[in-house]
Amino acid sequence: MADKYDVIVVGAGPGGVTCGALLAKWGLKTLVVDKNSQVGGKAMTLSKSGFRYEYYPIWPCPGAESQIHAALKVLGIEDRVELIQPDPFGLMHYETPSGEIGSMIMRGPGHPLDPQDLFKLLGVGDADTEEVLRLFGEVALMAPHDQDLLDDVSTIEFLDRYDIPRSVYSFFATLQSEGTIEVPSDIACASEVVKIFQQLVTGGSGCYPAGGLGAMYEAIAGAAQANGSDILLETRVDRIAVQNGRVGGVFTEKGAFYAPIVVSNAGIQPTVLKLVGEEHFDKSYVNYVGDLVPSLGFAGARYILSKPVLEYPVYLYFSDNTVSTTDHIMKAKSGQMPEQIYVFISATSLCPGRAPPGKQLVHTGLSCPADTKVDPKTWLDKVEAEVARIWPDVVKHIEESEYYGSAHISAISRDSVVPGAGGECIGLGQIVGQCGKHKPSAKAPISGLFYVGADAGSTGFFANNLAVASGMNVAKMVLQYFKTHPR
Ligand SMILES: Cc1cc2nc3c(=O)[nH]c(=O)nc-3n(C[C@H](O)[C@H](O)[C@H](O)COP(=O)(O)OP(=O)(O)OC[C@H]3O[C@@H](n4cnc5c(N)ncnc54)[C@H](O)[C@@H]3O)c2cc1C
């Protein structure tokens, strides 16, 4: 293995591995370093006791023509990653104020959401239909310029422009804020919500790589290696070397590696405040980075069931009272959980062959602060009570349970360097002031240093898709920089 490269990518999460693979394909001598034993970051797939599953519950989205499809195509490996599309892929449950739980089937790509089915589930009466259709129509057809005008508007402020029933309000505010971008709806950026909703409407949901998301990132890593990239796993980068305002490489526990370009997938805050060190940046930039707000973390449970209980890959539950705001999160942190919560549950049935015959692995959980010091128990107790109420059969067949919280998420993704951050599900929160035109630049104010992944380099996508989009955009920026900055 060499010790000199054109570019070093710190982190092989969805953004890092995509970026590294593209740069290798375009001829740059590339090293990708990750502290984990496999690629994929928070989206890695594990194999254990005959199961093959993601660390975390996965909402497969969007269904077609996503950034992920585009990246596989550019890398020329679209034939090597089988994207399966279970249809139907899930059930959406809505609980009425009188306590009845209705359900609506969610179809795969090619079967966009039918407003009539949704109206039935949400009890939209004739008197409200016109206004609800106005909301759906405006969101689904909003032009890019108008979307950009929502960069400074929260989801709740946007919804308040419409005189809609509470059920429709909650559908948007719960599912498109906490349920999709993992941020409270009072700060969720409306331009992000609208863009992602449009992708869902046009592309549908439910597209998923056979073998798991991690298998797809392994295929991308394979493409990187086939193009000459080195991939160094189980190696933590301790420091990104900077001298005279330029990066020079990285220091790891396995030695130093040199390159005039370093792309960090380790999160913008850990990169600036720890790996490079604040002494290399202007005070104002350090303050700006320190004040960035993470997405929410997650308190999750994995259950091994003695028999397959859930028929579909994913299930959602919400009610009029599941809209989560910053105030709810703060109250929950002090022990006051809301009475009703949004619940997401997913099963290994997403992809055949992912569980031993006769068994099923089920994920569930609830958003909680990204703070690695928060004990997830309060959230887990609540979510387990809700699972028992809504899906009693699941609880009856639990053979084994595993639990995790934000500290665990941090351990396999980014370090916690700012109080309250580290265990974020997505990365930087897609909130007002941090999205669209306000998204941090992927080019750091140090020569040769870039950020990649959910934190920078793309906006207006959902999680894995966001990180992969960043991988593609940042790879282009790096290539341009490489060509214009001869060594
Ligand atoms: C509970 C949960 C549920 C989720 N559900 C979904 C979902 O349903 N659908 C969806 O699309 N997405 C989902 N996501 C989010 C998705 O996984 C992330 O948005 C995505 O993984 C972000 O990719 P990334 O490239 O930004 O970085 P990450 O995935 O965070 O990867 C960063 C990589 O950098 C490495 N790294 C960091 N620091 C160092 C260092 N110092 N040295 C070496 N390596 C380092 C890490 O080990 C890691 O591999 C979920 C996440 C969680 C936690």
Indicate where each model-derived feature is located.
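A glycine-rich dinucleotide-binding beta-alpha-beta segment and adjacent secondary-structure elements
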Residues: 172-179, 393-459
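Glycine-rich FAD pyrophosphate-binding loop
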Residues: 24-48
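N-terminal Rossmann-like FAD-binding beta1-loop-alpha1 element of flavoenzymes
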Residues: 5-32
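C-terminal segments that line or cap access tunnels to active or ligand-binding sites in enzymes
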Residues: 306-412
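Helical element adjacent to the flavin cofactor pocket in flavoenzyme catalytic cores
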Residues: 196-247, 251
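Rossmann-like flavin
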Residues: 94-190
